[in-house]
A protein has these predicted regions:
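Active-site helix of classical SDR
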Residues: 110, 145
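Residue(s) in the substrate-gating loop at a strand-loop-helix junction
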Residues: 129
Length: 179
């Protein structure tokens, strides 16, 4: 069965995307860590889902098992964070946590599903922020992590073409809880 995967499916962007793809009669598999919200959305849209936290070691292994009979035709990695604070009070762990969530986890996902993605000429959409290029005050944590996402995007787009398309969207403020 051909499906799109939406990571962060219960967030503002992820849930909006899930609803839009439902309206377009596309099949999706929703991924998120909030089990109650994920079940509610999946039941409403009649989508399959996996409760998983991308910050947990071996999360990708469980996901690949859940998707063993699925042809993945697209991934939307709508997971993210925004920690805004003056640089002088940041800690190394702030940067590491943001890099793991925004960059490292998605590399585990893509690597784990690489053969599946290639076979299906899939598309991967990652998210950055305008802060990665604009230099906003107190955005050093998120802008550096999302700049890394943009670097990964152009590198993987070159490396994985023509079988897998990798793109990155860098929105400004959105109408969501996180914003």
């Amino acid at each position: 069965m051909k499906k799109y995967l939406i990571f962060g499916a219960t967030g503002g962007i992820g849930s909006k995307l899930a609803n839009q793809l439902y309206e377009e009669k596309k099949d999706c598999h929703l991924i998120g860590r909030n089990e109650e919200e994920l079940k509610k959305l999946a039941n409403k849209l009649n989508y399959s889902f996996t409760v998983c936290d991308v910050l947990k070691i071996d999360f990708a292994k469980k996901l690949v098992e859940d998707l063993s009979d699925t042809d993945v035709i697209g991934i939307a990695y709508c997971v993210g964070s925004i920690e805004i604070k003056p640089f002088k009070i940041t800690k190394a762990r702030d940067f590491v946590s943001s890099y793991v969530l925004n960059l490292v986890a998605v590399t585990d996902i893509i690597r784990s599903l690489l053969d599946n993605l290639k076979k299906n000429n899939a598309s991967v959409v990652l998210f950055s922020t305008v802060a990665a290029k604009k230099g906003f005050t107190n955005h050093s944590i998120i802008s550096s992590a999302k700049s890394a996402v943009e670097g990964l995007t152009v590198s993987l787009a070159a490396e994985l073409a023509p079988n897998i398309r990798i793109n990155c969207i860098a929105p400004s403020l959105t109408k969501s809880k996180m914003a």
